[in-house]
Amino acid sequence: MVKQLINVIIAGTVVVIMYNFLSHQDILIGDMLQKESVKGAYLTGAGFLDVNIKLWIYRIISIVIIIAVYNFIRGIKKEESKKILFSIILIPAALIIVFIVNIAIDSIFLRGNDIDREKEYILQNIRATEEAYNINVENKEIAKGTDITSEKIKKDSELIEKLPMVTPDVVKETLENNTDNKEKKSLYKYGNPNLVKNGNAYDYLTTREIDDKDKTLTNKIYKYTHGNFGILTSSSKVNKNGYLLNVSEKFEGQELNGTKIKEPRLYYGENTNSNAIVNAKDIKEYDYPTSTLTNKENNYNGKGGIKLSLLERIALAITKGSTELIFNNNIVENTKVLLNRQIIERAKKILPNIRYDKDPYLVTKDDGGLAWVIDGYTVTSRYPYSQKVSIEADKGGKERINFIRNSVKVVIDAYNGTVDFYVTDTTDPFISTIMKTYPTLFKNYNELSENIKKQMRYPQYLFDIQAKVLTTYHNSDVDNIYRADDRWEVAEVSGSGTRSSTSMYTLLKKGDELKPAIITTYTPEKRKNIVSYLVGQTENGANKLTMYRYNEKSELSLSFIDTQIEKDEKVQKEMRELTTLGAELKTVRILLPYEDTTLYIKSIYQVFLNEDSVPVLKKVIVANKGKVGIGNTLKEAMQRMLTENAIDIDVRDLANEDELKDAIIKQNKTLKDVMKQGDFEYTGKDIQRLIKLVDQLEEVSKEKKKKTNIEKTN
């Protein structure tokens, strides 16, 4: 009995010591600077007290536990009650002493200015955060915003006509509700529209995958087996009646990115969930409609799938729990079964160790075939010192992470189903470990064709996370991170009704051409003026971030200027003229950087209130620097923005008077605290901030009096 008790105690001791050891590691991903005197949010990592006090506390506790257990066991063996009692008292006594010492040290250290003490550890947090999120930003100052003139519009006429004013949401809504497309609509499920290069223009490609909903099991497995490329819709033009312009809806003979598509069939896809049996006896696959009454048929001739020999049929019957394949009369020598056709699940079955982007996209191959690209990420929440952010979890809800790298590009052949994993970031420690586990699985990124590299885009999932991190870490000065004096917020760049987006794919003018990019904008915390915009671009498959900062007077946010436009009587008159019985107006807002200024584009669509109604573009409103123009096209609206009939709006972002008063009170309190600490460097900085806030309050008060006097005069 005594021996068993001793073994239990020893096992318990080992568990406690292991827990203490793991607690050492947790300090590196815990929260530092948790005291009320710290103005900013918690930073991830071990601070001065963690490294110099808490780590030693864990070590001392481990030693005390070992001594106590050793004495306890000896006391039991020799039946010495004093040793047993001493051992029982030792651990709680040590914990009480450690607790008192910890409080005393905390209070002593927090009396002085702790920025100098914590500087080294905050710097580690900054470096680790930039490394963990792969944030290598090129900063560019915008000294003076570009003035849009008639000469500039004339010179850039061709480029302006190619600027995207149509959003992916409108494209998808149109395709799904188009009454002229009923037959195709019942056959196909449309993917998310993606901006692609098509000749000299950029269009939206919306993939057409077979929709197996409401189809019999036989039709689902044998007949309706595959989708077909997609529909190309102009991102910048509509037809003469205002309907979106489908550049190409063909099922064969399409061209994309300078490559003629020879094999447009999609046997593997984003929305292809069912298995398929191809080349079955006396059964032809549906290919695509050639007219309202006739269809083209097809037989699969790809490398994908498993030939259904008797042995394979028995194995599949056991796996699927069904004997249907064994006794199936439709199976002949060339019959194959195509399994795991949903591309993300297909990749997961091969490599479950990484996270996959939920928005794959289609690219053309050198041989005229099609392939899907899926971005793969390594993600963790246990990277030492890197700042944690809250994101949408892979399976719903929220999760906190502090490391993400887009280290893998997965390329899946849409016809054959072959899967290739290309490593894009060999500096990623996690992918390096995975590569050692699966040495033959990965390919070097240089092996991927240049044609596919050119078609790759910056992943929106990664971009949004990096943009969120940069709300704080855009200014990586230690003092700024410590005091949180220069925080930004991510602003809206596009919106429609209640839906809005903080990032979007668009085209940016670069010299004399347009380049695809993903953008987001920033405003200072609780303000509406845009101080910067972040651009993500992919050059030959490599992701690149550029931060454009306004040096002088900043631009205004989309939501603010949209409200100002809606208040104008001339705009309201135009809107009333478009109002028709049985229809509603739908507005789509876009913020678009154009050289060193920003265009605020508001597209007005008319939507009839019947079940299958599509948006019809009626007007385009453009605003820039207090001037607003309305036209039938973007170019026409920009031209009218420069005429005498242009609408003037007030674009000053005057802060709320009560908010400013609260900010002054808060800043005054901060100043007093800093003066008590005797920190002359921060005293000077805080005085400057207080003066700035008082100046802003004075400006708001003057404006308020001015408006009151005008109202009295009227």
Regions found by a protein language model. Name each.
Residues 1-677, 681-711:
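Soluble extracytoplasmic regions of secretory-pathway and membrane proteins
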